[in-house]
Curated annotation (Swiss-Prot):
Principal location listed in the UniProt entry: cytoplasm
Family: Belongs to the polyribonucleotide nucleotidyltransferase family.
Lineage start: Bacteria, Bacillati, Bacillota, Bacilli, Bacillales
Name this protein carries in UniProt: Polyribonucleotide nucleotidyltransferase
Catalytic reaction annotation: RNA(n+1) + phosphate = RNA(n) + a ribonucleoside 5'-diphosphate
Domain named KH: residues: 555-614
InterPro entries: ExoRNase_PH_dom1 (IPR001247), ExoRNase_PH_dom2 (IPR015847), ExoRNase_PH_dom2_sf (IPR036345), KH_dom (IPR004087), KH_dom_type_1 (IPR004088), KH_dom_type_1_sf (IPR036612), NA-bd_OB-fold (IPR012340), PNPase (IPR012162)
Gene: pnp
Length: 723
């Protein structure tokens, strides 16, 4: 049995311990991370033999357990089901800095699983899982060029903070996750409140200093318990075959890559590949399938090398653009007549149609995960159908990529969404990618800005996004603006930056090399700003301000404030009162605990009617006020008059007229309208009314006057007698 070993350090003011040797001993490597009261187990397993195919089969799983926060899962089965969006995004977050650190040609399957056992809300389980993934790999026998680490960075009043608490995060204007090795940054994910490029770069470099310390900490663990790395057979092409294929195809491939239009370029490249493959099929080789697979791989590498050489040496891109040139832009709003807002954004051969839907606040999304229960009134969803790239295949539920791109767009736009008080609506954006040749996630951000302006959402400022690329050969590097699909596929970086004219609102960086220096990051951010401002200028030329009026098909929401103690009156016993209002008017009603009432309907007349009913219900009678109401009930001692919805008062028989009244029915009948004056509201809230107080008193002869006894119209409640 392996002996448990514990390694500890301090991390953002909390104790961080890494335990190895006790749990998950059959995995290639495993580590239990304790960070504050957060506990995460990460296990890594690598297959002994390579898998067929021309890609690296790495799988990262992040499993949230509801028991970690003392909750029982909902639903009929009462057990964890499909991963939440947050779990999916965390798995992507861990995958991205780890993947570049496996050798090229590595084909053995690697699976990393992080299981959340306990959650301290101020100690991020995501960052613990990222650290655990690195530790599990570096102490295993799986060849991995780590360690890596990741940290969260915030900025409060100009001061940068590592792993901010929930309270600190609410005050922060930057929400950044950065990961990398001791030497360089290789993954960034950020949201921000329109911060400058300089502030974002400083936040990244501030985080890298803490990453260095965590990498040094892991080196101590490796020295104590690290296993010797196993020998792995890397996929390497046969040198003679490679030279042969290169000689036959290089010139033709170079010419094909320079074809500017995407579909024509793809066809030209495919023609070159088919010609070479057919020539090998004609040889009728004994191991034909294996040779053809290797030739196909060599041809793809030639395509990659030629594109990179063209950009790096000639500074020419496959479509003929300069390195900082943006593709042609076009946009349109109001395409769809019955939706609340729509925007079509096209950049080259990438096109996104975004649709904005407005709904009452009650239709917000409830997120019941490992954190506190959250209510989300702004959502952005991204769909990527296969026809957008001219392919066929089954249409499945949104995958990791679609969830990730939707979340990136949401993060980019959320800082310009008006507050609930300014605009009391739930806002859902859906971006449909209709055509894609790179940067579709950023096109969805631009389309969503157009859709919200078209819908009349008073956003603080328009937001645009741009994807930057990089080709690095040795010390020479070229930064590309507005990358297309081929440049993304064969390039070294996908660096997405979104923001307003005043600053960055979202940033995401993935790279395929070991890491990036501060200089490259700085230049990429500066070049991205130029591109973003160019795109924003185009967007505002299409629509510069939110529409003054909402769509005729959007719900109109009116806000009313009532006293919190009156909420029960509006709702009524068992919801009877509020349901009656909804049935009568067809509106939707939401009531907050502070007494804010939201009334929503496409019909403004019905909104006003519902408001009038509620105002009547919560209206308070005042002594001395005069009302006209209807007689709702008659008793021997008087008539009950409805002053307004939900409020009745009693006109005692003696208050009907100055003269003596024998029967109530002699003066009033059921359903009669009568004007009365409030003469008393007793300690139980009962209202006493008078009709005669509004009538002229007839003079009586002195002899006819009789002293009148004082009358109490509602019987007083007696206190129980003490025995």
């Amino acid at each position: 049995m392996s002996e448990k070993q514990v390694f500890s350090t301090e991390w953002a003011g909390k104790t961080l311990s890494v335990e190895v040797g006790q749990l998950a001993k059959q995995a290639s490597g495993a580590a239990l991370i304790r960070y504050g009261d957060t506990v995460v187990l990460t296990a890594a397993v690598g297959s002994k033999k390579p898998r067929p195919g021309d890609f690296f089969p790495l799988t990262v799983n992040y499993e949230e357990k509801m028991y970690s926060v003392g909750k029982v899962p909902g639903g009929f089965l009462k057990r964890e089901g499909r991963p939440s969006d947050r779990a999916t995004l965390t798995a992507r977050l861990i995958d991205r800095p780890i993947r570049p650190l496996f050798a090229e040609g590595f084909r053995n399957e690697v699976q990393i699983t992080s299981t959340v056992f306990s959650v301290d809300q101020d100690c991020s389980p995501e960052m613990a899982a990222m650290l655990g993934s690195s530790v599990a790999l570096v102490i295993s026998d799986i060849p991995f060029e780590g360690p890596i680490a990741g940290v969260d960075v915030g900025r409060i009043d100009g001061k940068y903070v590592i792993n901010p608490t929930i309270e600190q995060a609410e005050k922060s204007d930057i929400s950044l996750t950065v990961a990398g090795t001791y030497d360089a940054i290789n993954m960034v994910e950020a949201g921000a409140k329109e911060v400058s490029e300089e502030a974002m770069l400083e936040a990244i470099m501030f985080g890298h200093e803490e990453i260095k310390r965590l990498c040094e900490f892991q080196q101590q663990i490796i020295a104590a318990v690290g296993k010797e790395k196993r020998e792995i057979e890397l996929f390497v092409s046969d040198p003679e075959l490679e030279a042969e294929v290169k000689a036959a195809s290089e010139g033709k491939m170079k010419a094909a890559i320079k074809t500017e239009e995407k579909k024509a370029r793809e066809a030209a490249i495919e023609e070159v590949k088919e010609e070479i493959l057919e020539s090998y099929k004609a040889k009728e080789l004994e191991n034909e399938a294996e040779i053809l697979g290797e030739v196909a791989h060599i041809l793809e590498m030639i395509e990659k090398d030629e594109m990179r050489r063209l950009i790096s040496q000639d500074k020419i891109r496959p479509d003929g653009r300069k390195v900082n040139e943006i593709r042609p832009l076009s946009s349109e709003v109001g395409m769809l007549p019955r939706v609340h807002g729509s925007g079509l954004f096209t950049r080259g051969q990438t096109q996104a149609l975004s649709v904005c839907t407005l709904a009452p606040l009650r239709e917000h999304q409830i997120i019941d995960g490992l954190g506190t229960e959250e209510y989300k009134r702004f959502m952005h969803h991204y769909n990527f159908p296969q026809f957008s790239v001219g392919e066929t295949g089954p249409r499945r539920a949104p995958g990791r990529r679609e969830i990730g791109h939707g979340a990136l767009g949401e993060r980019a736009l959320q800082y310009v969404i008006p507050s609930e008080e300014e605009f009391p609506y739930t806002i859902r954006l859906v971006s449909e990618v209709l055509e894609s040749n790179g940067s579709s996630s950023q096109a969805s951000i631009c389309g969503s800005t157009l859709a919200m302006l078209d819908a009349g959402v008073p956003i603080k400022a328009p937001v645009a996004g741009i994807a930057m690329g990089l080709v690095k050969l040795g010390d020479d590097y070229t930064i590309l603006s507005d990358i297309q699909g081929m440049e993304d596929h064969f390039g070294d970086m996908d660096f997405k930056v979104a923001g307003t004219k005043d600053g960055i609102t979202a940033l995401q960086m993935d790279i395929k090399i070991d890491g990036l220096s501060r200089q490259i990051l700085d230049e990429a951010l500066t070049q991205a700003k130029e591109g973003r401002l160019h795109i924003l200028e185009h967007l505002t030329s299409t629509i510069s301000e939110p529409r003054e009026e909402l769509s005729a098909y959007a719900p109109k929401i009116i806000t009313l404030n009532i006293k919190p103690e009156k909420i029960k009156d509006v709702i009524g016993p068992g919801g009877k009162q509020i349901n009656a209002i909804i049935e009568e008017t067809g509106v939707k009603i939401d009531i907050e605990q502070d007494g804010t009432v939201y009334i929503a309907s496409q019909d403004q007349a019905m909104n006003r009617k519902a408001i009038a009913i509620i105002e009547d219900i919560v209206r308070e009678v005042e002594v001395g006020e005069v009302y006209t109401g209807k007689v709702r009930r008659i008793e021997k001692f008087g008539a009950f008059v409805e002053l307004f919805k939900g409020t009745d008062g009693l006109v005692h028989i003696s208050e009907l007229a100055h003269e003596r009244v024998g029967k109530v029915e002699d003066i009033l009948k059921l359903g009669d309208e009568v004007t009365v004056k409030v003469i008393e509201v007793d300690h139980q809230g009962r209202v006493n009314l008078s009709r005669k107080a509004l009538l002229e008193k007839k003079e009586q002869p002195e002899g006819d006057k009789k002293p009148q006894a004082e009358k109490k119209f509602y019987p007083k409640t007696k206190k129980p007698e003490s025995k």
